[in-house]
Amino acid sequence: MNSNDQDPIPFRPEDNNFSGSKTYAMSGKIMLSAIVILFFVVILMVFLHLYARWYLLRARRRHLRRRSRNRRATMVFFTADPSTAATSVVASRGLDPNVIKSLPVFTFSDETHKDPIECAVCLSEFEESETGRVLPNCQHTFHVDCIDMWFHSHSTCPLCRSLVESLAGIESTAAAREREVVIAVDSDPVLVIEPSSSSGLTDEPHGSGSSQMLREDSGRKPAAIEVPRRTFSEFEDELTRRDSPASQSFRSPMSRMLSFTRMLSRDRRSASSPIAGAPPLSPTLSCRIQMTESDIERGGEESR
């Protein structure tokens, strides 16, 4: 018989089972490896998360520690002007009782006030024959009891916060704008030179024909001089106008007095010996007056 005529190998179920078990074993190993790798990845993520939290907390603690160290090392000093501090303390205490009493008071009635008026402190309307105060700056009205209680701890209007004391004290400020200065004038002998002619005013040798006489008053005579209060801006304006051409024709009495004082000091330096024929002057005499024609012309030009 030929080999081709032999019977084929019969199929055995055991061979199929062996191949299937081998496939299952391979897939099980792959699954186990994937689970292990995934487990390690999860562990790594958890570790990174914990490390990040630890690092951030450590950096925050360092920052807080550095800030606290800087606060301890830094010393801050505050200085204040005593006058400014006193002003702020007085302002926080409220208005003066005299200023509160000086505020105008009115009595509410339907005849005088047709429109209803509401008090901003107690939020109630005025009733018949109730008294109220009007603030001079903002013209706001309030009950007397309400606004007086408010002004014990405040110095501004409850509605617009405008100052009240600045306008309430206008009368006292205006009354104090002028001061009365009393100067005691020592009436020592004063030398008066009466020229006989216009040419007698020139510088001549002592003992000339001009008549000299001394006028004496006994005791002291008080002189009351009213000096108006002038602000710094007024003095500044006067200084700026002094060099202008218009200032040559108009000058204040103070500038005239200064010019006359300069003229007296110049004449006092020029006078070296007493006038002949005149009695000796007392030691308290301020100066000897010796006027010339040029001085009179100069004084006239300065007083214009």
Swiss-Prot record:
* Presence of keyword Zinc-finger: yes
One Pfam family assigned to this protein is zf-RING_2
Which species? Arabidopsis thaliana (Mouse-ear cress)
- Positions the record marks as coiled coil are none
Q: Biological process GO terms, please?
A: defense response; protein ubiquitination
Gene3D superfamilies per UniProt:
Zinc/RING finger domain, C3HC4 (zinc finger)
Zinc fingers, RING-type, are found at: 119-161
Q: What does this protein do?
A: May be involved in the early steps of the plant defense signaling pathway.
Q: Where is this region: Disordered?
A: 194-304
User: What is its subcellular localisation?
Assistant: Membrane
Q: Any idea which UniProt keywords this protein has?
A: Membrane, Metal-binding, Plant defense, Transferase, Transmembrane, Transmembrane helix, Ubl conjugation pathway, Zinc, Zinc-finger
The Polar residues compositionally biased stretches are 283-293
Q: What is this protein's name?
A: RING-H2 finger protein ATL2
The domain comment in this protein's record states: The RING-type zinc finger domain mediates binding to an E2 ubiquitin-conjugating enzyme.
Bias kind Basic and acidic residues: ranges: 227-244, 295-304
What GO CC terms are in its UniProt record? membrane
What the entry lists under SUPFAM superfamilies is as follows: RING/U-box
Induction note: Up-regulated by chitin or cellulases elicitors.
Question: What does the sequence similarity comment in the record state about its family?
Answer: Belongs to the RING-type zinc finger family. ATL subfamily.
